[in-house]
Regions:
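Conserved PLP-binding active-site segment of the aspartate aminotransferase-like
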Residues: 30, 67-70, 347-356, 370-407
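Active-site phosphate-binding strand-loop segment of PLP-dependent enzymes
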Residues: 175-227
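N-terminal "arm"/small-domain region of PLP-dependent enzymes with the aminotransferase-like
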Residues: 2-93, 224
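Conserved PLP-binding catalytic core of the aspartate aminotransferase-like
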Residues: 320-334, 338-369, 379, 391-393, ...
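Conserved PLP-anchoring active-site segment centered on the Schiff-base-forming lysine
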Residues: 138-161, 174, 178-179
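Conserved N-terminal alpha-helix of the aminotransferase class I/II PLP-enzyme fold
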Residues: 80-127
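Active-site PLP attachment segment
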Residues: 248-284
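Conserved core segment of the aminotransferase class I/II
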Residues: 269-317
Length: 424
């Protein structure tokens, strides 16, 4: 019998052996220490573990400081009622057919509302990752852009929902990875290639914003296309909650594409693709050839109704009130614990710890009544582990002060008092 061929992976764009081999050990440690696989009932902002977790006692109460609902809109009465109202109006949960063939008007209603909110054309998707899966290959082939196949430059820290598309895009064009927010690298690519597309987070899941204004200069100079996932700043930042990118970028045309999830501060479900300057024919190409964007798994009617209600809240002074509460809570945290994100409006703080101590620290914080998620490779680079703290508008001063006291006990750096403050 002829010897069968074994395959040697190229590992050019991903390496599951490395990701799983190293990362799974941390996940197993997290679960053994009660920091993963948790199931808990939620009542008035307090979570209580249920029976069934091998390593966590039933009935342990804790406050979740790793939730992305930065404005707590996911529990807003108007948002909940909006989902119910849409169900009553349309009389169906999910009209299961590709929207390019037949659709009920529910998602069109949400797209129109979000389009007015953003001042742009909006296409909705079931998830931001689904939107990215549909759009990046079209950018790589030149069908979304100016017709020229671009060099696809993925930021080293781009979220996995984007970086996972490297091998798919590489079947259409050349793909490279840049150091994090390295403007010189990007400009050098722009000088060499007729067209360049840069793929990055507008707001990083580990804290911080993209250099939007500096990238806009490269857009004006070279025609650079920038694809932003700005999910973590939607609603939490900017007038009417339009997010960091659309607040600060002076290039809001076909050279800037923004994808945002509606699951975080917006408080509902699904995602929005925010487009400027694209003709109807191009939008049809997205609808027809954007992969899962055109499958029968669309936003269900309840999610649409909740989205409509949240969008209406964004048009009222209540949004500013919630943003201000969030910012005050961020400032309070920064006055007690120092991180690299101190002083920014970004709602995520990363408390750096070693790979060896991060799980134990997270366990001690959990035992004290708070959940903060430990992050480790492959979520972050090896040797840069930490506890990820997410601030929300609904957190109380007492909760924040208690959490910060526990964090400093497990190794967080206390904040440096302002001049004159220590003497009080």
């Amino acid at each position: 019998m002829t010897e069968r061929i074994s395959i040697t992976p190229t590992h050019r764009y991903r390496n599951n052996d490395k990701l799983i081999g190293i990362g799974n050990e941390f996940w197993d440690m997290s679960e053994r220490n009660g920091l993963a696989g948790l199931v808990a009932d939620l009542d008035s902002g307090v979570l209580r573990t249920t029976a069934g977790h091998e390593f966590v006692a039933d009935g342990h109460e804790f406050i979740n400081f790793s939730c992305c609902s930065y404005l707590d809109l996911d529990s807003h009465p108007r948002v909940i009622e909006g989902g119910l109202d849409a169900m009553r109006r349309y009389g169906v949960l999910d009209h299961c057919i590709a929207r390019s063939r037949v659709q009920i008007p529910a998602m069109l209603e949400l797209e129109d509302s979000l389009g007015e909110l953003f001042g742009a054309h909006v296409v909705c998707s079931i998830a931001a990752s689904t939107a990215t899966f549909g759009l990046l290959p079209l950018i790589a082939s030149g069908h979304l852009g100016n017709g020229i196949r671009p060099l696809m430059v993925f930021d080293k820290n781009a979220h996995i929902s984007m970086s996972n598309l490297k091998p798919v895009c590489a079947d259409e064009t050349e793909v490279v990875t840049s150091p994090h927010h390295d403007l010189d690298f990007i400009e050098d690519a722009c000088r060499k290639y007729a067209r360049v597309a840069y793929v990055c987070d507008g707001s990083d899941s580990l804290g911080g914003y993209a250099p939007v204004k500096e990238l806009a200069e490269l857009q004006d100079k070279y025609g650079l296309l920038v694809y932003y996932d700005d999910s973590h700043s939607l609603s939490a930042y900017g007038e009417r909650g339009v997010g960091y990118v659309r607040t600060h970028s002076p290039v809001l045309d076909e050279r800037t594409i923004v994808v945002v999830t509606l699951n975080k501060a917006f408080g509902t479900s699904g995602a929005a693709i925010v487009l400027d300057g694209y003709e109807k024919e191009t939008l049809r190409v997205i609808e027809r050839f954007g992969g899962a964007l055109n499958y029968s798994q669309l936003l269900n009617t309840a999610a649409v109704g909740a989205g409509l209600a949240s969008a209406e809240i964004h048009r009222t002074p209540e949004l500013t009130t919630l943003q201000d509460r969030l910012y005050r809570n961020i400032e309070l945290f920064d006055s007690l614990v120092h991180t690299e994100q101190t002083g920014s409006t970004y709602p995520i703080r990363l408390v750096p710890l070693s790979d060896e101590t991060v799980i134990e620290a997270g366990r001690r914080v959990f035992e004290a009544g708070f959940y903060v998620s430990p992050v480790f490779f492959p979520i972050v680079a090896r040797g840069t582990a930490g506890l990820r703290v997410m601030m929300r508008a609904g957190q109380t001063e007492e909760q924040i002060r208690r959490l910060c006291a526990v964090l400093t006990e497990v190794g967080a750096c206390p904040a440096i008092p302002a001049p004159g403050e220590a003497a009080r």
